[in-house]
UniProtKB/Swiss-Prot annotation:
Required cofactor(s): FMNH2
Keywords in alphabetical order: Amino-acid biosynthesis, Aromatic amino acid biosynthesis, FAD, Flavoprotein, FMN, Lyase, NADP
Positions bound to FMN: R125, S126, S127, N238, A239, G278, K293, P294, T295, S296, S297, R319
Gene3D superfamilies for the chain: Chorismate synthase AroC
Gene: aroC
HAMAP family: Chorismate_synth
InterPro entries: Chorismate_synth, Chorismate_synth_AroC_sf, Chorismate_synthase_CS
UniProt function note: This reaction introduces a second double bond into the aromatic ring system.
Protein origin, superkingdom: Bacteria
Name of this chain's protein: Chorismate synthase
Pathway: Metabolic intermediate biosynthesis; chorismate biosynthesis; chorismate from D-erythrose 4-phosphate and phosphoenolpyruvate: step 7/7
Length: 366
């Protein structure tokens, strides 16, 4: 099975399965000399970990990270950084009834057809459990970007099912389990999720992510455009079915006189481009939105087939997120951080000595 590595100069290779002894990743290409300890990574993992509210999976994983290599006396050495997260609360017996059947909307059928073998325990390699190593690697990337450029990456839930979540303030995001930027709407979200869980069903979500303090010049046209790599990484998150950069699909209805962000000596007027022009960062906020589909593992009876191709009815029991989007915010933030650090290192390698007389204008005009 290939396709387990992200990045060019700053690479992340993840490993493990949902019900295996451990999951983790190996980071290669991290610059030396950055202060790093397990607490730096644990903070981000705690934002993603399961069992934090009644609205997410009740699997109780501590998600305690162990740094196995690449850090000496509290600093990165430039060697590969191996990060390990042990699985401690597997309940594989919950999946015995789907060993020979395929859950609708899940990777069961395609994994079986492609590899001829499938770890049915919690989805194995296809499980959202494997986003934990991504978040761990993203914590390293976030720290380097923050210290090098002052880059800050924050996300929030913009919609839960048919409920739009109007943005009020970033301060609200860390105060509720939905990562909602609006405290007043949280009771409505809780009521909605309680009813959904009672019905044995699931729902999708929309997550917005913003990276501020991104330097101008990141991105490699034509096929390694910054926005192309962002979309590639975001689609690598379990259950993501759509990605928008900037105005995204709303650009269809915008005229050029509106969509094109004007430049003035004082700064850009607007950011419909989402901080990327021609595949290269403008120095403005990089804005990304992702659509997350409903969880495939639900108690509602669904039609499917077994390995023999015979019709069956599938009901999935066990501990599942009725909406994986609730815990997706730190995952999306991490993916964006991994793309940005990789392109920052690539830009430094090729164009670090480039200088032009044109001044860099502000991200937004006053």
């Amino acid at each position: 099975m290939s396709g387990n590595t992200l990045g060019t100069l700053f690479t992340v290779t993840t490993f493990g399965e949902s019900h295996g002894p451990a999951i983790g990743c190996v980071i290669d290409g991290c610059p030396p000399g950055m202060a790093l300890n397990e607490a730096d990574i644990q903070f981000e993992l705690d934002r993603r970990k399961p069992g934090t509210s009644r609205h997410v999976t009740q699997r109780q994983e501590e998600d305690k990270v162990e740094i196995l290599s690449g850090v000496f006396e509290g600093q990165t050495t430039g060697a590969p950084i191996a990060l390990l997260i042990r699985n401690t609360d597997q309940r594989s017996k919950d999946y015995g009834n789907i060993a020979d059947t395929f859950r609708p909307g899940h990777a069961d059928y395609t994994y079986w057809q492609k590899y001829g073998i499938r770890d049915y325990r919690g989805g194995g390699r296809s499980s959202a459990r494997l986003t934990a190593p991504t978040v761990a690697a993203g914590a390293v990337a976030k720290k380097w970007l923050r210290e090098k450029f002052g880059t800050e990456i924050h996300g929030y839930m913009a919609a839960l099912g048919e409920i739009d979540v109007p943005f009020v303030d970033w301060a609200h995001v860390r105060e509720n389990p939905f990562f909602a930027p609006n405290a007043q709407i949280v009771p409505q979200l809780e009521t909605y999720m309680d009813a959904l869980r009672k019905d044995g069903d699931s729902i999708g979500a929309r997550i917005n992510v913003v990276a501020s303090g991104v330097p101008v010049g990141l991105g490699e046209p034509l096929f390694d455009r910054l926005d192309a790599d962002i979309a590639h990484a975001m689609m690598g998150i379990n259950a993501v079915k759509g990605v928008e950069i900037g105005a995204g699909f709303a650009s269809i209805a915008q005229r050029g006189s509106v969509h094109g962000d004007e430049l003035t000596p004082e700064g850009f007027v607007g950011n419909h481009a989402g901080g990327v022009l021609g595949g290269i960062s403008t120095g403005q906020d990089v804005t990304v939105s992702i659509a997350i589909k409903p969880t495939s593992s639900i108690r509602t009876p669904r039609r499917s087939i077994d390995k023999a191709g015979q019709p069956v009815v599938v009901e999935t029991f066990g501990r599942h997120d009725p909406c994986v989007g609730i815990r997706a915010t730190p995952i999306a933030e991490s993916m964006l951080a991994l793309v940005l650090i990789d392109h920052a290192l690539r830009h430094r390698a090729q164009c670090g000595d480039v200088a032009v007389s044109t001044p860099k204008i502000a991200a937004s005009a006053p």
